[in-house]
Amino acid sequence: DLRLTGLQASSRQRALAIDFGGYLKGVALDRATSILLAQGVGNALVNIGGNVMVLGSRNGQRWRVGIQHPRQPGPMATIELEDGEAVGTSGDYQRYFEVDGRRYSHVLDPRSGRPASGTQALTVLITARPAAGALSDAASKPLFIAGSEWPDLARRLHVQHVLRIDGDGHWQVSKAMQGRLEFVARPPPSLTVVP
């Protein structure tokens, strides 16, 4: 029961809440890095709930961040970030619920109104550009929801760097992202490179 009137949304359901946190973290990244730059800070790593954006370098070296494994403790890979780049991940492993042993993501598929399925985790890297933080956050969700159709959507969104773990634990990586990843152990045997 959500009513939209112009730019205003309302409901009679007292329990209804709309949470924009999933997209506003990326906007907050852009805002935080702008404030840091305005204050003369040229080197920083900003992490807002798993969304990361970097400025400059770490003691002359690129910033290196880990990409969390969706089913095991610790990172599955690391990636070096250059000045102004941002990383965003959507997954079913931090906010979820289980019913009869089946995991349901907190990310809803707007086509069905049900939790998105078929993807355990999806990470995007956005190269330095205006609103890189917002795009890293905003792009990871629809690509997560798109499931196996993510390559077509990534092309339409102009997102070149993508890593996806599907619902069965198979890894898919865009060619551009493959060149940026360093696997913690060895590359997984079920890795598919998507052109």
PLM regions with names:
Residues 1-195:
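Mature catalytic core of soluble alpha/beta enzymes
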